[in-house]
């Protein structure tokens, strides 16, 4: 059998064959010309006993073909039986087509893993499209807390995933440095400045930030300005103190993110929208006004419970209802300043004008009600050419042995990100923050994430990678020329008699490896990096189970002392496993250790 092209994974290749069969049926008149094949998929069947792959082609094409799904399935199945890769074709239920592939396919799929090495799973599905992923964007008013941590990890892993799938990714952080909260920060820092000068400031007043983390800001202000700011009116000292406090908070935030191996290419200041000789917020409002999307009007009172920001007055409104929102939205406050929404529209227009028609924002759970208006605004400012996907990241409940963790005294009222990373490590934080879908509340137990057991997914997956390398070290008694270098080892092992990997458990593991590129593409298109974490856990579980079988059934051991050829074949399978585990862990931003102590 000819080798599979490395650039095309099995599922994509089978889909192309199904499309070719449909094209032949169009030629024969069994399908109408121009029929839409975009809904046709090839995927693993829900029940593995039904085969290796399944297609819905007959189900989704039957209506346009004016045929019964089962009858159309018969025609498609007849042609698929002639395909080189396919061993058996069966029609199930109303017209699903189940495919069983020839055993030799899985040996060639393993060779594709070995040939691609670290590049296995990389895809061109993104086509180089530019995508902007904005994540974290925590207010620069204090250290990052554990709630920020989940959004940071999710956004970073999503950016890695999109890059792996062939998108041109920019990682961006939006600095909220123009709102009232940074003035509160400045007043809080000014108290710490007075404290640094020797004053007794007493208890921090209600409404200011109480944490000790602002003491270094006070010391820095003293070092730079001495007592010069102390007796100035607030209007004079506030801009200076605010700028210093924001700069120091952002450096602290960058340090917190670095502890999780997170970096951004772009830090965009909200204040830059209205400073520097150009007011982009005003420009955006006028741009929308010229389109008829901004008008002067009054909003009706909200139904049900009162809304805090409702004002019964004539105001400048964005016609959000024309783009699917429930109500039109104010752009100016009663004091003439811009609403946060107005700044947000301008910010996203800047991104679109920079070439990002594809934008992803990662927001906290408390911003869910903001999505509709923002997506309406994107449609308006991009004339329907831009797309915004908002990923909501739910809350994290921090536990220790099932009990809630007490708050941090230094931070004031929350547990800091740095405290969590220092205790359990970046790998445990990143993996476990991704081991649940982003829109579900996550329980993060500080004791359980460092357990060395199969009940701890991060340990289980990393141990799979380490176990693979342990097998390589032990195999040198049987295969003394086994290279240390991963590429050289893969090049040697691809020559092994891989067709001897015919035990059902071995074949299942090879099938799991062949699934990985499809998982990457599907996860990238859905913006769901948790799918990678789930897949890695399943792969590691199958690998560990096969190793355990070898303890009980000597003929299934990875290393057979008197059979170098089957040993080489099984080492090739192990090489495939460690390559895919390393690739997936890299997407998640988690290390792949060669040994664990």
From Swiss-Prot:
Monomer. The keyword Nucleotide-binding applies. The keyword Oxidoreductase does not apply. The gene is argS. One of its GO terms (molecular function) is ATP binding. Its main location: cytoplasm. This is Arginine--tRNA ligase. The lineage of its organism: Bacteria, Pseudomonadati, Pseudomonadota, Alphaproteobacteria, Hyphomicrobiales. It is an enzyme of class 6 (ligase). One of its GO terms (biological process) is arginyl-tRNA aminoacylation. PROSITE patterns: AA_TRNA_LIGASE_I. Its EC number is 6.1.1.19.
């Amino acid at each position: 059998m000819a080798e599979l092209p490395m650039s095309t994974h099995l599922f994509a290749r089978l889909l192309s064959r199904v499309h070719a069969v449909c094209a032949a049926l169009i030629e024969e008149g069994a399908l109408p010309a121009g029929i839409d094949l975009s809904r046709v998929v090839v995927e693993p069947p829900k029940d593995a006993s039904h085969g290796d792959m399944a297609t819905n082609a007959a189900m989704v094409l039957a209506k346009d073909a004016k045929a019964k799904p089962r009858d159309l399935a018969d025609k498609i199945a007849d042609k698929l039986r002639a395909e080189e890769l396919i061993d058996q074709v069966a029609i199930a239920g109303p017209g699903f087509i189940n495919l069983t592939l020839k055993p030799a396919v899985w040996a060639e799929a393993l060779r594709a893993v070995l040939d691609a090495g670290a590049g296995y799973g990389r895809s061109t599905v993104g086509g180089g499209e530019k995508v902007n992923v904005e994540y974290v964007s925590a207010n620069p008013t204090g250290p990052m807390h554990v709630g920020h941590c989940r959004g940071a990890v999710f956004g970073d892993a999503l950016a890695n995933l999109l890059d792996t799938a062939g998108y041109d990714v920019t990682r961006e952080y939006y600095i909220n440095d123009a709102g009232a909260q940074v003035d509160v920060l400045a007043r809080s820092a000014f108290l710490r400045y007075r404290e640094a000068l020797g004053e007794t400031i007493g208890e921090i007043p209600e409404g200011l930030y109480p944490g000790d983390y602002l003491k270094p800001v006070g010391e820095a202000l003293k070092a730079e300005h001495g007592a010069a700011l102390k007796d100035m009116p607030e209007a004079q000292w506030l801009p200076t103190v605010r700028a210093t406090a924001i700069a120091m908070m952002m450096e602290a935030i960058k340090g917190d993110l670095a502890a999780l191996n997170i970096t951004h290419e772009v830090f965009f200041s909200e204040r830059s929208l209205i400073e520097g000789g150009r007011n982009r917020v005003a420009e955006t409002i006028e741009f929308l006004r010229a389109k008829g999307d901004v008008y002067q009007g009054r909003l009706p009172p909200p139904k049900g419970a009162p809304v805090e920001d409702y004002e019964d007055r004539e105001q400048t409104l964005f016609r959000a209802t024309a783009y699917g929102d429930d109500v039109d939205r104010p752009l100016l406050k009663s004091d003439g300043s811009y609403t946060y929404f107005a700044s947000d529209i301008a910010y996203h227009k800047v991104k679109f004008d920079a070439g990002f028609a594809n934008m992803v924002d990662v927001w906290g759970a408390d911003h869910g009600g903001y999505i509709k208006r923002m997506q309406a605004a994107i449609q308006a400012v991009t004339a329907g050419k831009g797309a915004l996907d908002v990923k909501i990241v739910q809350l994290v409940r921090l536990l220790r042995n099932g009990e809630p963790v007490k708050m941090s005294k230094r931070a004031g009222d929350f547990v800091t990100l740095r405290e969590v990373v220092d205790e359990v490590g970046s790998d445990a934080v990143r993996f476990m923050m991704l081991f649940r879908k982003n829109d579900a509340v996550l329980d993060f137990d500080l004791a359980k994430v460092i357990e060395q057991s199969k009940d701890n997914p991060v340990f289980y997956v990393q141990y799979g990678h380490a176990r693979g390398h342990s097998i390589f070290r032990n195999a040198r008694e049987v295969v003394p020329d086994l290279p240390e270098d991963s590429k050289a080892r893969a090049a040697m092992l691809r020559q092994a008699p891989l067709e001897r990997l015919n035990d059902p458990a071995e074949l299942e593991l090879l099938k799991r490896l062949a699934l990985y590129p499809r998982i990457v593409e599907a996860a990238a298109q859905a913006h769901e990096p948790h799918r990678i974490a789930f897949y890695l856990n399943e792969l590691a579980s199958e690998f560990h189970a096969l190793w355990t079988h070898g303890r009980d059934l000597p003929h299934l051991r990875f290393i057979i002392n008197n059979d170098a050829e089957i040993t080489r074949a099984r080492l090739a399978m192990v090489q495939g496993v460690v390559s895919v585990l390393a690739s997936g862990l890299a997407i998640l931003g988690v290390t792949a250790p060669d040994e664990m102590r």
